[in-house]
A protein has these predicted regions:
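Amphipathic, coiled-coil-like alpha-helical segments
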Residues: 2-21, 45-53, 60, 68-91
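A short hydrophobic/aromatic micro-motif that marks alpha-helical segments and, especially, helix-coil
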Residues: 34, 65-66
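Solenoid-repeat scaffolds in large eukaryotic assemblies
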Residues: 34-35, 54-55
């Protein structure tokens, strides 16, 4: 069973470049609905595959998006940049 999970996790990991590109594109286009949807999906799926730090960062971004009245654009951008670094360096 662990070998099967390792294979699934590896396949999921290979999807990170596309996920990173999607998040980056949504942010650059200021498409907050798409950004929210992508980050929300990533928050759930990444945790399920053992990428807990990525999941936590996604939840942080979602929280900031929900409370955008109290959060600056710079804070959200900083959080997204941290997420992109996590996705780029994940193993």
């Amino acid at each position: 069973m662990p070998d099967k999970f390792a294979a699934l996790r590896k396949k999921y990991l290979s999807s990170f470049p596309a996920k990173l590109e999607g998040v980056e594109d949504a942010w650059e286009k200021h498409d907050m609905k798409l950004l929210h949807d992508l980050v929300h999906k990533l928050a759930g799926s990444s945790g399920g595959y053992g990428f807990d730090e990525i999941s936590r960062q996604c939840k942080n971004i979602l929280s900031q998006l929900h409370e955008s009245k109290n959060t600056t654009t710079n804070d959200i951008e900083r959080a997204i940049n941290q997420l992109m670094q996590l996705l780029s360096s994940a193993q």
